Design a protein with these regions (language model features):
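Conserved RNase H-like, two-metal-ion catalytic cores of nucleic-acid enzymes
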Residues: 1-110
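Metal-dependent phosphoesterase core characteristic of DEDDh/y 3'-5' exonuclease domains
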Residues: 2-7, 72-94, 111-180
Length: 180
């Protein structure tokens, strides 16, 4: 990737949580997702996190549902950028998820027209796919700056600090607090 000027970066981060507070609420309000969680989500986390094997399905839902866009929702999107050597930060937190996503798309459309790159830690494999899926679930058209089904990995206009820190390796530790 060619050198990117810092005044052409939009630093982006999302915060997520489960769509419902408890698995009982999920069962009451969305039986299809409840059955899907019991069939797939529950077993996925038991397989990948053996230390949580003894947790109930409800405990697993509470702990992990926010990590999957099918079972979670976005509660905050924060964006930072540099204008005239001054750092600016904007967070979208008011209203529900749909309002947050609409404001995010408006911002992304504006920076796309200005030739910006997106920047974040694990942005390519978490934030952008999560945003895209939640936008589709909420019937909101994603911004053209976001990757779509036919975008090749090298075509994504995003600088991922996790990738930068790993220097091409997938084995090292690269948690954001370790990088900082």
């Amino acid at each position: 990737m060619n050198e990117i000027k810092e005044n052409k970066l939009l630093f982006l981060d999302i915060e997520t949580c489960g769509s419902y507070a408890t698995i009982e609420e999920l069962e009451d309000k969305n039986l299809i997702l409840f059955n899907l969680w019991n069939k797939m989500g529950d077993s996925y986390f038991r397989r990948h996190y053996p230390e949580d094997e003894r947790m109930s399905s409800g405990e697993l839902y509470k702990k992990y549902s926010g990590l999957l866009p099918e079972f979670g929702r976005i509660v905050c999107v924060s964006a930072g950028f540099i204008v005239n050597d001054e750092r600016k930060i904007q967070s979208f937190i008011k209203g529900g998820e749909e309002e947050i996503l609409k404001e995010t798309v408006n911002l992304l459309n504006r920076v796309h027209k200005l030739g910006f790159y997106l920047c974040g830690h694990n942005i390519k494999t978490f934030d952008l796919p999560y945003l895209g899926k939640r936008m589709l679930i909420n019937k909101i058209k994603p911004s053209p700056i976001m990757p779509s089904y036919d975008t090749k990995p090298w075509e994504i206009k995003a600088l991922d600090t996790k990738e930068l820190w790993n220097f091409g390796s997938y084995k090292g530790l690269s948690a954001l607090h370790l990088v900082c």
